[in-house]
Amino acid sequence: MLDLGCGDGTTAIPEAMLGANVLGVDIAENLVAAGNARARDLGLSNIRFQVGDASQLSELADDSFDLVVSIFGAMFAPRPADVAREVVRVTRPGGRIVMGNWIPNDPTLVAQILRISAAYSPPPPEGFVSPITWGIDDTVIERFAAAGVPADSVSLERDTYTFDFAGTPSQLLALFRDYYGPTMNAYAAAAASGREADLHTELEALFNEQNASTEPGATTIPATFLRVTVAV
């Protein structure tokens, strides 16, 4: 199994604990180091993490994996057409690709975080393709078609990821502020333009409004995403 945009192993490590042979690839060296440290601490010899770009997997051979997974990861890689081609290339015939992608204009948490963050961030460079276009059905089908996968081999469905957090919405926001790339970048840009307080107020209101928990000091926020399953 290959996990692209693996972070420190949120998906990859549980799969390895179930017995899969897993390679995790992420662009962030600190997350790769953290993933390898977690694997060592757990005594897992069937998983490793390495630095890499989901749009350029030249170090990986064709037809290397039975399963390629990317949950909210490869969607943020540059050159989405290259991402589609690369994940198809490294998947064995008869294998599967599974992606979880946030959906543009969705009213739930992460799509709204990305919308708000973009409003406080500098304009993207010319030619930039928004990562959230990976949440558009027709766009996903077109990208995999260009990689040689017919539309009837691509399955798309709406699904829900639930943030269950043993803390307040403000404390969950603090984690996003410190560790989630789009939010980190938005806070940095807002601080530079003197709008950090406005950004924080807007995001804090969002987290509080979306919290479905009735327990004091707890947070439960559902977020809708597009689950993409590709038969290769």
Regions found by a protein language model. Name each.
Residues 153-215:
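C-terminal helical/coil "lid" or tail adjacent to the Rossmann-like core of SAM-dependent
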Residues 2-57, 82:
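Class I SAM-dependent methyltransferase SAM/SAH-binding core
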Residues 77-78, 91-93:
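Helix-to-beta-strand junctions that scaffold the AdoMet/dcAdoMet cofactor pocket
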Residues 55-67:
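A short acidic, Gly/Pro-enriched loop at the edge of an enzyme's catalytic core
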Residues 147-149, 223-232:
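Core SAM-dependent methyltransferase catalytic element
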Residues 66-80, 103:
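A short SAM/SAH-binding and catalytic strip from SAM-dependent methyltransferases
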Residues 21, 95-96:
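Short glycine-centered segments of the SAM/dcSAM-binding site in methyltransferase folds
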Residues 81, 96-169, 183:
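Conserved catalytic/acceptor-binding region of the Class I
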